[in-house]
Amino acid sequence: SATVYGEAEVLPVTEQTPRLPATSPYGNTKQMCEDILRDTVLATAASDGAVKGIALRYFNPIGAHPSALIGELPRGVPNNLVPFITQTAIGKRECLSIFGNDYDTADGTCLRDYIDVVDLAKAHVAAVSRMVEGRMKKDYEIFNVGTGRPVSVYELVSAFEKVNGVKLNYRFAPRRPGDVVAIWADTQFANDELGWKAERSVEDTLASAWAWEKHLAGK
């Protein structure tokens, strides 16, 4: 997860960007997971049962399968922004809260790197293929999985409205503890080594998310 970078001092982040202290319990657990995987690889390196590992640092996965038959189905209150958007648009939720509009960004809202879930799935296939086919150059490798393009929360909301012809009821709320101001990926390493690159646009992805929400509602 990209949360391992914490509040990065230089953007975009590469795989060599230092990991700073996590800004949330979620980010802390992701750092722990990477440490466990790395240590397992190191501990077994000289044994007959040597383990190899690839860590994919996801940025912000969004969207659904283009068929609208597979998508994100949160239990209870969603943890991610796009299900909040689609549930507000469909009428499940009365109002969308945008947490913070006083950040040091162009429109005052946080910047994120939103990647289509189908592109993310393809990154997994590329990583597994690299491992199975013996193309890893190290026993433990790390890849950023994002688009390399920062999009603000407000831009994402506006894009959803424009692409889907839906007007959202939203309000600005106080900042949420643990949210970093901005994070987006340098994906050159994944592009070169995995032969993978994000292909779907934010607009296509938001259209797929809305199609999925309507499918759930039987519309």
Language-model segments: which ranges?
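Catalytic helix-loop patch of NAD(P)-dependent Rossmann-fold dehydrogenases
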Residues: 4-60, 69-77
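Conserved sequence/active-site signature of Rossmann-fold short-chain dehydrogenase/reductase
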Residues: 3-4, 61-64, 120
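Short, well-ordered alpha-helical segments in soluble proteins
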Residues: 41-44, 66, 89, 131
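C-terminal substrate-binding subdomain of Rossmann-fold SDR/epimerase-dehydratase oxidoreductases
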Residues: 81-219
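Short, basic/glycine-rich phosphate-binding loops at helix/coil junctions
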Residues: 63-65, 102-103
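Short aromatic-enriched loop/helix-cap "lid" or pocket-rim segments at secondary-structure transitions
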Residues: 9-11, 65-70, 110-111, 156
